[in-house]
């Protein structure tokens, strides 16, 4: 994801996820409110602490005048718990947490028409079941990658061919 796309996505998401009380998606973007509180996985939304190339916040703050506050969470359960307590505008939840947040009414639908380039997304990503519920879109894809099944060859001399060995 380019830095510009990351900044744009952050802006749109921040504006689209203003409060849980709003039942319908926004119809237009207004001036930023001045503060954006985010729950994120460590390393997902950075100020360049670990690598100067990954400072996604400073330019966003400069362009919008909106202060970004990031609270990192180590697990999906922690993200869901923090969102339940309130006070956050955006969460970088994984699929398992996304559905809990949606069903728990902790997030609101977003208006994808306000997101530049939404129509160009691969439908496999844009229509993800982990953020599309009841005909409404509750999130945007941030990253996409494999979930690997690794195993100990001493325990499984024949490679597992299904996740059923885990669940």
Regions found by a protein language model. Give the residues of each.
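Short, intrinsically disordered, charge-balanced linker/junction segments flanking boundaries
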Residues: 164-167
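Pocket-edge structural micro-motifs
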Residues: 40, 151-153
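Early extracytoplasmic/lumenal segment of secretory-pathway proteins
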Residues: 23-101
């Amino acid at each position: 994801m380019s830095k510009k796309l990351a900044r744009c996505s952050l802006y749109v998401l921040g504006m689209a996820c203003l409060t849980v009380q709003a039942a319908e998606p926004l119809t237009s973007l207004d001036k930023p409110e001045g503060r954006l509180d985010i729950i994120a996985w460590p390393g997902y939304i950075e100020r360049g602490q670990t690598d100067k190339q990954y400072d996604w916040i400073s330019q966003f703050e400069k362009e919008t005048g909106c202060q970004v506050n990031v609270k990192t969470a180590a697990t999906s359960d922690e993200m869901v718990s923090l969102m339940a307590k309130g006070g956050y505008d955006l969460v970088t939840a994984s699929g398992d947490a996304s559905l809990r947040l949606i069903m728990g009414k902790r997030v609101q639908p977003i208006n994808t028409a306000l997101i530049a380039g939404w129509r160009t997304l691969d439908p496999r990503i844009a229509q993800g079941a982990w953020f599309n519920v009841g005909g409404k879109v509750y999130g945007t894809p941030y990253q996409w990658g494999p979930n690997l099944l690794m195993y100990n060859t001493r325990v499984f001399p024949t490679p597992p061919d299904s996740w059923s060995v885990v669940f």
